[in-house]
C-alpha cells in the first residue's frame, strides 16, 4: 500500500527540521516496537484467526488508516490512522514470522536496515533523481501487484517478483525520504511521512525474508 505524498500540505504549526525528523524517527520506532510486541505475544492468536475475516479486516483497516492520515487536518486523527496501519500489519507479521527460522529473520532485519540507511544516504546525495521517480514507482508497483495476482491465479511460481519488489521498495524509501525533506515541517506531516516510510520498510523486509527463506 503506497501513496503519493502531497508536499504542499501545510497543516498545523511548523516545527524545526530537526524536530520534524526526530518525530518521523519516533513514529517509525513506535510502529516497529508495537509490531515486535505483537509478534512476541500474539503469534498463536494470529495464526488461528479466520483468514477471510482477517484479510477483509486488514484491508479495511489499512484503507481507513491511509484516508485518515492523508485527509485529516488533525494530528491526533492522523496518529489514529497510523495505528490502523501498524496494528493489522503487526497481526500479519505475528501470523507469518513463526513460519520462518530466526536466522532468516535476522538476516532480513539487518539487510533491511542497511538498505534503508543506504537509500537515505543516496537520496540525500542525489535528491533530484529521486524527485522524478514518483509516477514511475507508483506505476511499477501497480503492475507488480497485477502480475503477482495473475501468477497467483494460475499457480505460477513468483520467486523472481520478490527481487523486483525489493528494488521498487528500496527506491521508494529514497523517494519518500526526499519527499520528507521537501515537505512542510509539521507534526501531521511527520506522521504522514513516517507512515509512508513504515510501509516501504515493512514491505522490503518481508520480500527480503521471502528471498532468503527460498534460498535455504
Cite the ranges covered by each PLM segment.
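A hydrophobic alpha-helical transmembrane-helix feature that marks the membrane cores
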Residues: 1-216
Amino acid at each position: 500500500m503506497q501513496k503519493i505524498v502531497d508536499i504542499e500540505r501545510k497543516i498545523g504549526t511548523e516545527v524545526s527540521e530537526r524536530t520534524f525528523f526526530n518525530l518521523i524517527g519516533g513514529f517509525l520506532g513506535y510502529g516497529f516496537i508495537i509490531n515486535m510486541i505483537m509478534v512476541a505475544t500474539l503469534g498463536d492468536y494470529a495464526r488461528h484467526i479466520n483468514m477471510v475475516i482477517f484479510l477483509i479486516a486488514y484491508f479495511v483497516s489499512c484503507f481507513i488508516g491511509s484516508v485518515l492520515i492523508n485527509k485529516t487536518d488533525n494530528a491526533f486523527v492522523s496518529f489514529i490512522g497510523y495505528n490502523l496501519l501498524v496494528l493489522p500489519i503487526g497481526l500479519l507479521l505475528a501470523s507469518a514470522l513463526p513460519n520462518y527460522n530466526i536466522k532468516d529473520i535476522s538476516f532480513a532485519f539487518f539487510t533491511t536496515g542497511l538498505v534503508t540507511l543506504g537509500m537515505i544516504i543516496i537520496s540525500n546525495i542525489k535528491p533530484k533523481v529521486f524527485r522524478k521517480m514518483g509516477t514511475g514507482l507508483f506505476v511499477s508497483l501497480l503492475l507488480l501487484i497485477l502480475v503477482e495476482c495473475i501468477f497467483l491465479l494460475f499457480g505460477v511460481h513468483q520467486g523472481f517478483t520478490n527481487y523486483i519488489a525489493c528494488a521498487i521498495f528500496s527506491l521508494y524509501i529514497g523517494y519518500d525520504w526526499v519527499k520528507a525533506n521537501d515537505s512542510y515541517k509539521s507534526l501531521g506531516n511527520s506522521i504522514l511521512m513516517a507512515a509512508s516510510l513504515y510501509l516501504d520498510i515493512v514491505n522490503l523486509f518481508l520480500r527480503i525474508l521471502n528471498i532468503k527463506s527460498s534460498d535455504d
